From Swiss-Prot:
Residues 227-229, 352-357 are annotated as: Interaction with NEDD8. This is NEDD8-activating enzyme E1 catalytic subunit. Its EC number is 6.2.1.64. Residues 242-248, 292-295 are annotated as: Interaction with NAE1. Changing residue 214 to A: Reduces affinity for UBE2M. Changing residue 237 to S: Abolishes thioester intermediate formation. Arg-211 acts as a selectivity gate, preventing misactivation of ubiquitin by this NEDD8-specific E1 complex. It comes from Homo sapiens. GO terms for biological process: endomitotic cell cycle; post-translational protein modification; protein modification process; protein neddylation; proteolysis; regulation of cell cycle. Coiled coil: none annotated. The gene is UBA3. Residues 368-463 are annotated as: Interaction with UBE2M core domain.
């Protein structure tokens, strides 16, 4: 190529040369696999090394399994989910499903790189799938603009691995319970083929964690529930009478003024994704803050308090997503021993990582298959049982529904989620366990939004 050629001619010539090379190499063809495309993956799968699994035998079959067969479900398409989807798609995983119930907000664009300004208001799952399917040849990402609770066991059973990038503990607990419900036991022995591995990642600011869960074999979410701090709630007396923080003012407007004034019409609930709703809360919070000489109420803080927004840092998402994607790769190929089983990451003051083995809980309400023993006096009221279920660090239920078999009939003692039944069963809360007809050794079945399964409790009376 002559040195005097203009830049445009040089560019065209380079494009022609690249096109010729692609034609010689076979191009993308129908498979979208040009020569050398998967060399970076083959290095891990077609040769052994000091870190490979002792039973691993290098072959071409593992790569073909990734490309043609392995189905992975990614739950969450936010900051962590975008990183996960990108990593998996570029690592050879082609059969990917993604679930997310959220839509794209302008505040997402600084770190959720699969989205653009034109996508604001559209479902995250659909936009992420479109982007990857268009950008990565032969990648088939199937979107689901749904809640995870919208799908049954048949749907989840089809996947080889499930990886989560969630910001909700309730959602984590639900999918954990679903995967445990898929397990099959023969004469008390777990059938390994019924296990769907769960890779869970989470981030908050400059901190993050990743864990590998083999349901029925290793510690599940419920086994280590105490590791999750309870949601911070401000006392109502402080919010109403003695506010000291800007958050107190915002919570006052959210919890008291909104239901009282109903600014957007009777029965219209507060929508944290509606700018008009947030603006109304913001203005009223400013007014209350000025009454008590409190500074710091901003629109961003208002949005964060109303939506319970967790602070996000793009670099933390990238690190944790890389760990999770690596674990998916290790389990899918059996080439390397997976993480055992919990990793924490912290780069607040430097860089710190630590890995440890979380142990299974013998009486775990989710994976132990044992009824949970609870002790109460016969004179204790049902309200005390309800408080125990919601306040216990090892249970942390949100709206438990309690049923029991009395005189051969299944009887609902209390159910909160259905208004008519809640009104009918509310008087039971002030009754003693003895008055309700419960006896020592009675089994109580408790349903809750945190799990798709019913949790069994065995009631023991204390003297």
């Amino acid at each position: 190529m002559a040195d005097g050629e203009e830049p445009e001619k040089k560019r065209r010539r380079i494009e022609e040369l690249l096109a010729e090379k692609m034609a010689v190499d076979g191009g993308c063809g129908d498979t979208g696999d040009w020569e050398g495309r998967w060399n970076h993956v083959k290095k891990f799968l077609e040769r052994s090394g000091p870190f490979t699994h002792p039973d691993f035998e290098p072959s071409t079959e593992s790569l073909q399994f990734l490309l043609d067969t392995c189905k992975v479900l990614v739950i969450g398409a936010g900051g962590l989910g975008c990183e996960l989807l990108k990593n998996l798609a570029l690592s050879g995983f082609r059969q990917i499903h993604v679930i997310d119930m959220d839509t794209i907000d302008v505040s997402n664009l600084n770190r959720q790189f699969l989205f653009r300004p034109k996508d604001i208001g559209r479902p995250k799952a659909e936009v992420a799938a479109e982007f990857l399917n268009d950008r990565v040849p032969n990648c088939n990402v199937v979107p689901h603009f749904n809640k995870i609770q919208d799908f049954n066991d048949t749907f989840y059973r089809q996947f080889h691995i499930i990886v989560c990038g969630l910001d909700s503990i309730i959602a984590r607990r639900w999918i954990n319970g679903m995967l445990i419900s898929l397990l099959n036991y023969e004469d008390g022995v777990l059938d390994p083929s019924s296990i769907v591995p769960l890779i869970d990642g989470g981030t908050e600011g400059f901190k993050g964690n990743a864990r590998v869960i083999l349901p029925g074999m290793t510690a599940c979410i419920e086994c280590t529930l105490e590791l999750y701090p309870p949601q911070v709630n401000f006392p109502m007396c402080t919010i109403a009478s003695m506010p000291r923080l800007p958050e107190h003012c915002i919570e006052y407007v959210r919890m008291l003024q909104w239901p009282k004034e109903q600014p957007f019409g009777e029965g219209v609930p507060l929508d944290g994704d509606d700018p008009e709703h947030i603006q109304w809360i913001f203005q009223k919070s400013l007014e209350r803050a000025s009454q008590y000489n409190i500074r710091g109420v901003t629109y961003r803080l208002t949005q964060g308090v109303v939506k319970r927004i967790i602070p996000a840092v793009a670099s933390t998402n990238a690190v944790i997503a890389a760990v999770c994607a690596t674990e998916v790769f290790k389990i899918a190929t059996s080439a390397y021993i997976p993480l055992n089983n919990y990793l924490v990451f912290n780069d607040v003051d430097g860089l710190y990582t630590y890995t440890f083995e979380a142990e299974r809980k013998e009486n775990c309400p989710a994976c132990s298959q044992l009824p949970q023993n609870i002790q109460f006096s016969p004179s204790a009221k049902l309200q005390e049982v309800l408080d125990y279920l919601t306040n216990s660090a090892s249970l942390q239920m949100k709206s438990p529904a309690i049923t029991a078999t009395l005189e051969g009939k299944n009887r609902t003692l209390y159910l909160q989620s259905v208004t008519s039944i809640e009104e009918r069963t509310r008087p039971n809360l002030s009754k003693t366990l003895k008055e309700l007809g419960l006896v020592d050794g009675q089994e109580l079945a408790v349903a809750d939004v945190t799990t798709p399964q019913t949790v069994l409790f065995k009631l023991h009376f204390t003297s």
